A protein has these predicted regions:
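Structured core of small recognition/catalytic domains
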Residues: 121-175
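Hydrophobic membrane-targeting and insertion signals
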Residues: 28, 35-40
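Short, solvent-exposed interaction modules
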Residues: 79-145
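A cross-kingdom feature marking solvent-exposed beta-strand/loop segments within repeated
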Residues: 38-54, 115-123, 145
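Intrinsic disorder/low-complexity detector
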Residues: 4, 9, 14-16, 21-30, ...
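Acidic, Ser/Thr- and Gly-enriched intrinsically disordered low-complexity segments
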Residues: 46, 60-63, 70-75, 115-119
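A short, charged, amphipathic alpha-helix used as a generic interaction element across diverse proteins
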Residues: 1, 58-71, 129-145
């Protein structure tokens, strides 16, 4: 598809631009904060809260995925909140459960005005500490052609990430 002013052109067909909007990113992450009652080792019941990051297309899909994943091990599950996340990319090394949010800033040229502007990108990286998260984020971005800086790295409360899984058609085995 080629964008031409206020129309979209696909082969010989011309469509109004509003009718053919595409999402800015294929990955859309949501924060889901849930609370539940958990029995402690001493037999007492304690209310706990956990935050999850879910790669989903909607709030409804986010809720369904968390219920499917977490509901197996927890009975009374309550949603405290579901919100859009600014995270645009997840980099997992699989060696730790700590997740850090890295703010990456790079300069870009605005195609409309031709002026230079700063663009912010948020990347989630798992690491053992802030320094390792910074190094891993920097290593992940080393092939980026424009200069960038990482002004902020902070630990998050995310305990699990549920990436999108393509549904398996009926009659096929999942690998």
């Amino acid at each position: 598809l080629i964008s031409v002013e206020k129309t979209m052109v696909a082969g010989d067909a011309v469509f109004p631009a509003a009718a053919t909007k595409t999402p800015k990113s294929m990955n859309q992450y949501f924060f889901a904060k849930v609370s539940f009652l958990r029995q402690q080792n001493d037999g007492t019941i304690k209310k706990e809260s956990e935050q999850y990051l879910v790669d989903a297309m909607s709030f409804t899909e986010t809720e369904a995925r968390v219920i499917r994943e977490v509901g197996e091990s927890v009975r009374d599950l309550y949603f405290d909140s579901i919100a859009h996340s600014p995270i645009q990319e997840v980099v997992s090394y699989g060696d730790t459960d700590l997740w850090f949010k890295c703010k990456v800033v790079y300069k870009d040229v605005d195609p409309d005005s031709g002026k230079e502007k700063k663009t912010t990108l948020y990347i989630l990286v798992n690491a053992n500490d802030v320094n390792e998260a910074y190094d891993r984020c920097k290593d992940h971005l080393k092939s980026m052609l424009v200069p960038f800086e990482i002004p902020k790295v902070e630990e998050t409360a995310i305990c699990e990430i549920y990436q999108y899984e393509k549904p398996v058609p009926a009659g096929y085995l999942k690998r």
